[in-house]
């Protein structure tokens, strides 16, 4: 899979998220650049499952040295390798293993059920709490420490995406 052909931002206000892990999975897949394929990194040590599809924004570089992470609120899980054109609505700031690690939260741009969702204010607070709790707890049994710093709304996303695209280039 040639990731260079997948633009980070196909149009203003929309990003591409390459799915690595389908919602509901305990398997943690990662895209292996050398193999150009998805490989099983590990099975989560705890009983938690990814609440929604999870992946990364191609052709970006975040502060942790990896592409910018993203989670897509979607009703039907997709599959590893699926590219979702998504509208970012905010991001979760956290520290993972001592490094800053932002997780963009987005909705599918082509799903009419989410046409009204423009910011974190359009998502039930309990849903945001569940997502934050997933990231807080899923590494506990691996003895890895994460710290949740909080949610940033949609007005902060553009700067994060632009910075990550610039860092990649």
Curated annotation (Swiss-Prot):
The keyword Iron-sulfur does not apply. Belongs to the PPase family. The modification N-formylmethionine is found at residue 1. Mg(2+) 2 binds at residue 69. Substrate binds at residues 28, 42, 54, 138. It is found in: Cytoplasm. CDD domains: pyrophosphatase. Gene3D superfamilies: Inorganic pyrophosphatase. The gene is ppa. One of its GO terms (molecular function) is magnesium ion binding. InterPro entries: Pyrophosphatase (IPR008162), Pyrophosphatase_sf (IPR036649). This is Inorganic pyrophosphatase. One of its GO terms (cellular component) is cytoplasm. In the presence of Zn(2+), Mn(2+), Cu(2+), Fe(2+) or Co(2+) ions, activity is very low. In the absence of metal ions, there is no activity. The keyword Transferase does not apply. Mg(2+) 1 binds at residues 64, 69, 101. Its EC number is 3.6.1.1. Catalyzes the hydrolysis of inorganic pyrophosphate (PPi) forming two phosphate ions.
């Amino acid at each position: 899979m040639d990731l260079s052909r997948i633009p980070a931002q196909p149009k203003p206000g929309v990003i591409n998220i390459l799915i690595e892990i389908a919602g509901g999975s305990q398997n943690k897949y990662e895209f292996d650049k050398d193999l150009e394929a998805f490989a099983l990194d590990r099975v989560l040590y705890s009983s938690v499952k990814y609440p929604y599809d999870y992946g990364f924004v191609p052709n970006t570089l975040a502060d942790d040295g990896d592409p910018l992470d993203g989670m897509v609120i979607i009703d039907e899980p997709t599959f590893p390798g699926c590219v979702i054109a998504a509208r970012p609505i905010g991001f979760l700031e956290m520290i993972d293993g001592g490094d800053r690690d932002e997780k963009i939260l987005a909705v599918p741009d082509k799903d009419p059920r989410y046409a009204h969702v423009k910011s974190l204010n359009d998502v039930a607070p309990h849903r945001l709490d569940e997502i934050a709790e997933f990231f807080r707890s899923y590494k506990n049994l691996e003895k890895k420490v994460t710290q949740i710093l909080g949610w940033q709304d949609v007005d902060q996303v553009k700067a994060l995406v632009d910075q990550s695209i610039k860092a990649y280039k």
